[in-house]
């Protein structure tokens, strides 16, 4: 590694808080868009028999139920992962024991 790349690598540790916040917000937006895409694809395949000019009541009810179950399942998984993370010791703490 030459001196210019080592100095730029050292500068990476001091990230601008505004830039970091912007990246976090954009990452959340990307995750949300991916979730919407997955949900749309899944529910479309499940609920749409024959696309027509108007959504019939059966398809509408199916879409509503599908979206609600998708959200419930996603929330359950996130909560479960959060519980799992809380119950595991932090890596650095486990090394000091």
Curated annotation (Swiss-Prot):
Disulfide bonds join 43-66, 47-62. The modification Phosphoserine is found at residues 57, 87, 94, 96. Pfam families: zf-Tim10_DDP (PF02953). It is a peripheral membrane protein. GO terms for cellular component: mitochondrial inner membrane; mitochondrial intermembrane space; mitochondrial intermembrane space protein transporter complex; mitochondrion. Keywords: Chaperone, Deafness, Disease variant, Disulfide bond, Dystonia, Membrane, Metal-binding, Mitochondrion, Mitochondrion inner membrane, Phosphoprotein, Protein transport, Translocation, Transport, Zinc. GO terms for biological process: nervous system development; protein insertion into mitochondrial inner membrane. A motif (Twin CX3C motif) lies at residues 43-66. The keyword Cell cycle does not apply. It is linked to Mohr-Tranebjaerg syndrome: An X-linked recessive disorder characterized by postlingual sensorineural deafness with onset in early childhood, dystonia, spasticity, dysphagia, mental deterioration, paranoia and cortical blindness. Mitochondrial intermembrane chaperone that participates in the import and insertion of some multi-pass transmembrane proteins into the mitochondrial inner membrane. Also required for the transfer of beta-barrel precursors from the TOM complex to the sorting and assembly machinery (SAM complex) of the outer membrane. Acts as a chaperone-like protein that protects the hydrophobic precursors from aggregation and guide them through the mitochondrial intermembrane space. Heterohexamer; composed of 3 copies of TIMM8A and 3 copies of TIMM13, named soluble 70 kDa complex. Associates with the TIM22 complex, whose core is composed of TIMM22. This is Mitochondrial import inner membrane translocase subunit Tim8 A. The lineage of its organism: Eukaryota, Metazoa, Chordata, Craniata, Vertebrata.
